[in-house]
Amino acid sequence: MTNIRKTHPLTKIINNSFVDLPAPSNISAWWNFGSLLGICLIIQILTGLFLAMHYTSDTATAFSSVTHICRDVNYGWIIRYMHANGASMFFICLFLHVGRGLYYGSYMFTETWNIGIILLFAVMATAFMGYVLPWGQMSFWGATVITNLLSAIPYIGTNLVEWIWGGFSVDKATLTRFFAFHFILPFIISALAAIHLLFLHETGSNNPSGIPSDSDKIPFHPYYTIKDILGALLLILMLMLLVLFSPDLLGDPDNYIPANPLNTPPHIKPEWYFLFAYAILRSIPNKLGGVLALIFSILILAIIPLLHTSKQRSMMFRPLSQCLFWLLVADLLTLTWIGGQPVEHPFIIIGQLASILYFMILLVLMPIISIIENNMLKW
């Protein structure tokens, strides 16, 4: 009798994706982040669902409802902080996942890569709208500043912003629609993640060497299931350490002040995971230019496959490209730091130089260094 796991239409899909899937024998821990992102998404949907049961998306009661969740709901505090810090873990995994893709040339799977970029935008949009919901000072002013950027679009800008706001400022209508979108987007993200996997399984996984691994495959289960479980345990450990010992470490104290349209906080800044993009936005003195740089700072990932000039896929055997890659990482950390600093000397010039370097590395230096490395192979 044939195993039901391999014949039943439903279990067959699961079997071919997570059990009998042929996987390269040499994929490292950097390949764990896909499954970790899946776990993050599940944690966020579950904690978010329970928060939504007690939250009210009305300007008069939103802040109070979050306070009520933390004080009066059974284990509401842990659900709230798991959701807030779960977003941080989500972005840590996302950045490491994208970084892995850049380092090992996984972007050569263009369909998988492009769906990944769409996923990144969707997660960023979800996180932004979620940050508005507690209706604290940083929620309100963050929403005001970021939505206002759309007014830089010529001709239709102002109308577009007022249409998104549902009025002449960020108000009740804005909060209600942001809650609606924040609720629906994770399910769209789940569907996109399934498509992401579908495209990945068309080609099979890349591996650290960047060399085709068709001749050396092992079954996903038990080898990579046990490896993913270890990764998941470490992820949950890190999340719970954050939640139980310093839940407000990554948050902004201003968000414990209820939203007040008449009082602007001294330093308006987004959550830490948006600071690099915020620094790029602020480094250009022109409003439209800043918005374009902001969008292009993420969208640049879409043209990475076109800029691949190396004869090798992975950076594993390319020491010059490795140096550039780690320079890029250091540059992004610098931008993240600058994004959280006030707009004054010397932070302005550091931010501008770091922004120029970011685009220089990806658009100019990487392709040139790859060509140099190709020529070095001939020596």
From Swiss-Prot:
Question: Which GO BP terms apply?
Answer: mitochondrial electron transport, ubiquinol to cytochrome c
Residues reported in the UniProt entry to bind a ubiquinone: 201
* Localization terms from the record: Mitochondrion inner membrane
Cofactor(s) in the UniProt record: heme b
Query: What are the alphabetically sorted keywords of the record?
Result: Electron transport, Heme, Iron, Membrane, Metal-binding, Mitochondrion, Mitochondrion inner membrane, Respiratory chain, Transmembrane, Transmembrane helix, Transport, Ubiquinone
Main localization of the protein described in the UniProt heading: mitochondrion
Indicate how the chain sits in the lipid bilayer: Multi-pass membrane protein
Q: Metal-binding: is it a keyword of this entry? A: yes
- What GO CC annotations are associated with the protein? mitochondrial inner membrane; respiratory chain complex III
Q: Does the keyword Transport apply?
A: yes
What does the record give under GO molecular function? metal ion binding; ubiquinol-cytochrome-c reductase activity
Residues annotated to bind heme b b566:
97, 196
**Which Pfam families does the annotation name?**
Cytochrom_B_C, Cytochrome_B
The regions listed as transmembrane in this protein's record are 33-53, 77-98, 113-133, 178-198, 226-246, 288-308, 320-340, 347-367
Q: Which residues form the signal peptide?
A: none
Task: List ligand-binding residues for heme b b562.
Answer: 83, 182
What binding details are noted for the cofactor? Answer: Binds 2 heme b groups non-covalently.
Coiled coil stretches, renumbered: none
User: InterPro entries, from UniProt?
Assistant: Cyt_b/b6_C (IPR005798), Cyt_b/b6_C_sf (IPR036150), Cyt_b/b6_N (IPR005797), Cytb/b6-like_sf (IPR027387), Cytochrome_b (IPR030689), Cytochrome_b_C_euk/bac (IPR048260), Cytochrome_b_N_euk/bac (IPR048259), Di-haem_cyt_TM (IPR016174)
Q: Which domain of life is it from?
A: Eukaryota
Concerning its family, UniProt says: Belongs to the cytochrome b family.
**Other comments on record:** Heme 1 (or BL or b562) is low-potential and absorbs at about 562 nm, and heme 2 (or BH or b566) is high-potential and absorbs at about 566 nm.
Description of how the protein assembles with itself and partners? The cytochrome bc1 complex contains 11 subunits: 3 respiratory subunits (MT-CYB, CYC1 and UQCRFS1), 2 core proteins (UQCRC1 and UQCRC2) and 6 low-molecular weight proteins (UQCRH/QCR6, UQCRB/QCR7, UQCRQ/QCR8, UQCR10/QCR9, UQCR11/QCR10 and a cleavage product of UQCRFS1). This cytochrome bc1 complex then forms a dimer.
As for what it does, the entry says: Component of the ubiquinol-cytochrome c reductase complex (complex III or cytochrome b-c1 complex) that is part of the mitochondrial respiratory chain. The b-c1 complex mediates electron transfer from ubiquinol to cytochrome c. Contributes to the generation of a proton gradient across the mitochondrial membrane that is then used for ATP synthesis.
Q: What is this protein called?
A: Cytochrome b
The record's gene field reads MT-CYB
